[in-house]
Swiss-Prot record:
Originating organism: Encephalitozoon cuniculi (strain GB-M1)
Entry's Gene Ontology molecular function annotations: 7S RNA binding
Family membership: Belongs to the SRP19 family.
Assembly behavior: Fungal signal recognition particle consists of a 7S RNA molecule (scR1) and at least six protein subunits: SRP72, SRP68, SRP54, SEC65, SRP21 and SRP14.
GO biological process: SRP-dependent cotranslational protein targeting to membrane, signal sequence recognition
Entry's localization field: Cytoplasm
One GO cellular component term noted in the UniProt record for this chain: signal recognition particle, endoplasmic reticulum targeting
Free-text function comment from the UniProt entry: Signal-recognition-particle assembly has a crucial role in targeting secretory proteins to the rough endoplasmic reticulum membrane. It must be involved intimately in the translocation of a wide variety of protein substrates.
Name of the protein in its database record: Signal recognition particle SEC65 subunit
Record keywords: Cytoplasm, Ribonucleoprotein, RNA-binding, Signal recognition particle
Matches recorded under InterPro entries: Signal_recog_particle_SRP19, SRP19-like_sf
Region (Disordered): 90-115
Length: 137
C-alpha cells in the first residue's frame, strides 16, 4: 500500500550538504541551511496542505528538529522548487532578516570548528586540546 504523503526534513533541501550527508534534491533547487520555521512559512504562503511534526528529527541531522508530511498530489519537485523560491524571497526582503543569535555572534569573528563523528561542532570559546607530554626514555 502506497502512502499518500511524502516527508520533508530541512536537511533534504540544504544546499550546503552533499548527497551523502543527507541532501535529497539538486543543489539548483535547494536553499542554504533552511530552517523549520522558514519552510513552515513558505508552505503557508504557497497554501499547500501539510502536517508538521516539530519534534521529529532526521538521523543525519539530529540537532535540527522538524518534519513535514505533504500530500503527493502537489508533486515533490513542484513543492520543493516553490518552497526554495519562497524562502529566497523571504530572506531577500529588507527588515525581515531573521538571524539566529549564533549567526549574530559569529559575524565578524572567525569561528572554527571540528567535525566529530560526522557532526560539525563549533569551537565558540576557542578552546585548544592539551598536548600530551612526551615520555622520556
Amino acid at each position: 500500500m502506497e502512502s499518500k504523503h511524502f516527508c520533508l526534513y530541512p536537511i533534504y533541501m540544504d544546499s550546503a550538504r552533499s548527497l551523502s550527508e543527507g541532501r535529497k534534491y539538486r543543489k539548483e533547487i535547494c536553499v542554504q541551511r533552511p530552517r523549520y520555521h522558514e519552510i513552515k512559512n513558505a508552505l503557508e504562503k504557497l497554501e499547500i496542505e501539510y502536517t508538521d511534526e516539530p519534534s521529529k528529527k532526521h538521523p543525519r541531522d539530529f540537532f535540527n528538529s522538524g518534519r513535514f508530511r505533504i500530500k503527493k498530489e502537489y508533486g515533490r519537485l513542484f513543492v520543493i522548487e516553490g518552497i526554495s523560491q519562497t524562502i529566497a524571497e523571504l530572506r531577500s526582503k529588507p527588515g525581515s532578516s531573521e538571524e539566529t543569535s549564533r549567526e549574530k555572534q559569529s559575524r565578524g569573528k572567525a569561528v572554527h570548528g571540528v567535525v566529530q563523528n560526522g557532526v560539525y561542532v563549533e569551537n565558540k570559546l576557542n578552546l585548544v586540546r592539551k598536548k600530551k607530554a612526551k615520555k622520556k626514555k
